[in-house]
Amino acid sequence: MHEMAICMGIIQIVEEKVRERSSSRVRSVCLELGTLSHAAPEAIRFCFAVAAMRTVAEGAALNIVELPGVAWCMSCSKSVEIARRGDCCPCCGSYQLQVTAGEQMRVKALEID
């Protein structure tokens, strides 16, 4: 389950930002998660709750903003939304797609006391 390693990294980022601001607690974390990132949102939620135990993030809400997968079709020269790798172009049916967005994962915002 690589989601636990991801959440441990998120907690490290959160703790670093809390130290920088001399704060003591995190109320919420906003995470942008691309649909092509290979991370399951529900697994991320579960692992975040476990990873946050006994840290400044314990009890913090995790808000996940899911970002769509986007690819450039080399056949019809259009930017198209895709649900997963291996999908065909919804415009022309070609499989010659280059992923341009949807693989990202980042901490977008923190609400800190």
UniProtKB/Swiss-Prot annotation:
GO terms for biological process: protein maturation; protein modification process. This is Hydrogenase maturation factor HypA 1. It comes from Bradyrhizobium diazoefficiens (strain JCM 10833 / BCRC 13528 / IAM 13628 / NBRC 14792 / USDA 110). Involved in the maturation of [NiFe] hydrogenases. Required for nickel insertion into the metal center of the hydrogenase. It holds the Pfam family HypA. The keyword Zinc applies. The gene is hypA1. Keywords: Metal-binding, Nickel, Zinc. GO terms for molecular function: nickel cation binding; zinc ion binding. Zn(2+) binds at residues 73, 76, 89, 92. Ni(2+) binds at residue 2. Belongs to the HypA/HybF family.
